[in-house]
């Protein structure tokens, strides 16, 4: 019967350095781009998505207001409009992804 024992590593582990694997060189990825810069860049690349998001939020807010006022017909209309706005936003995201995938790399 084999006994279990501790395995001693060849070199001591240092938490400040990444492990070294054969054929893999670790790189540190640093992105100086902040949230604002990334948001503006993504908005310039695909401006339809933020428009769809704002339309969805506006319709949702108006629907909640109609619901709070007790206007069920307006509230129901806003629910249907919200679904259409969400579909528009999803379609814009998918078309943006397709356009990015088809764009040739520089």
From Swiss-Prot:
The chain crosses the membrane at residues 47-67, 82-102. Residues 20-106 form the HIG1 domain. It is a multi-pass membrane protein. Keywords: Membrane, Transmembrane, Transmembrane helix. PROSITE patterns: HIG1. One of its GO terms (cellular component) is mitochondrion. Its main location: membrane. Residues 1-46, 103-106 are cytoplasmic. It holds the Pfam family HIG_1_N. Gene3D superfamilies: 6.10.140.1320. This is HIG1 domain family member 2B. It comes from Homo sapiens (Human).
